[in-house]
């Protein structure tokens, strides 16, 4: 929900408010996160990425992940030699998952170009450590959104960045 009337309408239809989301935009952060490295994701990473998504969300997003790997936008973050997170792309329209905030910071810091794709990247505002890190590294808040669901919802058990699409 991005508008007060939408929020009220969806709430009256039975949707549950789950999370305030901050759209962040600006020059991509170029910071090295100790102990983390990032590389382009490959087909051989799918099983590890799906396991991380299941650990954080209770389900995987295999279809989006496979499509992103084919498009060349997916990346994985490694702590040592172990995959500890991934992104389908650092845009408004792609999700990211990590076991820790440092995993997401490394992924966010791997962006290239002049800005993050679309209106920006989506950061759960209640993840104050990650939200403040983005602000302290020059990103600006451009839009406030509300994540709402109807039906089954698993409270995330790790670090994540949602997609506007799913």
Where are these regions (language model features)?
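Intrinsically disordered, low-complexity, positively biased terminal segments
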Residues: 39-166
């Amino acid at each position: 929900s991005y508008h007060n009337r939408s929020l009220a309408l969806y709430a009256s239809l039975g949707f549950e408010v789950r999370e305030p989301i901050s759209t962040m935009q600006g020059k991509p952060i170029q910071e090295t996160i100790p102990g983390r490295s990032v590389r382009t994701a490959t087909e051989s990473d799918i099983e590890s990425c799906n396991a991380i998504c299941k650990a954080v969300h209770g389900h995987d997003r295999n279809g989006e992940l496979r499509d992103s790997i084919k498009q060349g936008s997916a990346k994985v973050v490694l702590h040592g030699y172990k995959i500890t997170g991934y992104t389908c792309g650092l845009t408004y329209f792609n999700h990211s998952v990590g076991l820790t905030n440092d995993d997401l910071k490394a992924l966010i810091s791997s962006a290239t170009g002049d800005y993050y794709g679309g209106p920006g990247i989506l950061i759960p505002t209640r993840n104050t450590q990650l939200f403040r890190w983005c602000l302290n590294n020059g990103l600006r808040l451009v839009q406030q959104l509300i994540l709402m669901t109807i039906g089954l919802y698993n409270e995330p058990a790790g670090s994540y960045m949602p997609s506007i699409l799913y």
